Amino acid sequence: MTSPEIASLSWGQMKVKGSNTTYKDCKVWPGGSRTWDWRETGTEHSPGVQPADVKEVVEKGVQTLVIGRGMSEALKVPSSTVEYLKKHGIDVRVLQTEQAVKEYNALVAQGVRVGGVFHSTC
């Protein structure tokens, strides 16, 4: 099963190939995608992305996880989250969201089992 390509990104809107949903923030993994609802884990810009935010994607068996910090990189990624991913043997890439989408799509094209969590506003 391959990871779906991110078809488009603009402020507050993301489209994933194979999904009719327009996402504000989203999670993607081999074979699927869904809304990333920060309320599920109490996530805020700071301290930022928590292990609980990425756990679902990790459990899908990804080799690499790309984190999009927002268009202005307002979303933090604490070292505890990076350590959690590394402990699970996952290569992690933390980037500004436009760059993160480019990196994610390049990895998809290479056939990597890649997942991602992306914030499409600030």
Curated annotation (Swiss-Prot):
Biological role: May play a role in preadipocyte differentiation and adipogenesis.
Family designation: Belongs to the AAMDC family.
UniProt keyword annotations, A-Z: Cytoplasm
Matches recorded under CDD domains: Mth938
UniProt subcellular location: Cytoplasm
Protein name: Mth938 domain-containing protein
Region annotated MTH138-like domain, chain positions: 6-122
Top-level taxon: Eukaryota
Pfam families registered for this protein in UniProt: DUF498 (PF04430)
Residues annotated as transmembrane: none
Species of the source: Homo sapiens
GO BP terms, alphabetized: negative regulation of apoptotic process; positive regulation of fat cell differentiation; positive regulation of transcription by RNA polymerase II; transcription by RNA polymerase II
InterPro entries hit by this protein: AAMDC, MTH938-like_sf, NDUFAF3/AAMDC
Coiled coil: none
